[in-house]
Amino acid sequence: MNNYFLFPRAFIISLLLPTLAMAALPASEPVPGGIAIIAVGTAAEKAPHVGFQGNRVMVVRELNSWHAIVGLPLALAPGKHALTITTPNGIAHRQSFDVSNKIYEEQRLIISDQRKVDPNPEDLTRINRETAIQKKAFMFWRNEAPDNLIFDMPAQGRFSSAFGLRRFFNDQPRQPHAGLDIAAAEGEPVTAPADGIVIETGNYFFNGNTVLLDHGLGMVSMYNHLSRIDVTPGTQLKRGQVLGLIGKTGRVTGAHLHWTVSLNNARVNPALFLPEEIRARLK
């Protein structure tokens, strides 16, 4: 496994405030696994520091206001929650917001390789090691705003499994589906949906061949089950550049791309970053 954390990072660590004026924001859906977009100050002042559940939150400028783009974990309880906001002059306060309930559908899959459902002790050691690597990647922070918060599709194909599905493998309950699946022929290209820097590549027990991209301000995306990886940690990708090929490595029932988007260390629905006409295909 290769990871960007071993590389010198000074050349990309910017001390500048994220002052990008966004052309568009992602879709706001304040539910578990969704995104809350919350105005947190006027753009006449410098950007505030915003935190949620111990993680720093993306803040971007839209017109004359600063907005927090808050990732909401799938396990988050519905109800009242609060951001911690610290102004540029050091004054801290809390700002509450509401999270609505959402019931995700069930999905039952049959996996032919039983080890991918009930790993042996050696597999579990590997899984724990790989989980730690991915957790570190999802917590990565680069103080530079993304080029755009509306993503392109990372692969051409049909949506085969929606985000948030309550999954059962061989009738055994497992973690919910924390990504969006796009079914396509093996060997078809997978491209960066927005500008990003490769921070991790590797072959994982469940995820197969995997690439993780940092887009800035705590936004990280992940691409799983690739048949081939075409990038290395530190590679700077422009929107539309190929990072690998569709495959069926790891725990799969067929060739597809599993696409994950993480905000402030919370896995959120990637569809919320797609244009409305593409999101409509999921409804």
Features from the language model and the residues they span:
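Terminal peptide-recognition signature
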Residues: 54, 83, 159, 182, ...
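Conserved, short, structured surface segments that act as functional micro-motifs
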Residues: 210-214, 219, 235-283
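N-terminal secretory signal peptides that target proteins for export/translocation
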Residues: 1-7
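Short, well-structured beta-strand-loop connectors
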Residues: 189-199, 228-246
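Bacterial N-terminal signal peptides
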Residues: 9-19
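Zn2+-dependent peptidoglycan hydrolase active-site motif and core
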Residues: 193-227, 255, 260
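Surface-exposed, glycine-biased beta-strand/turn segments
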Residues: 96-207
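Cationic-aromatic interfacial patches
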Residues: 23-96, 101-103
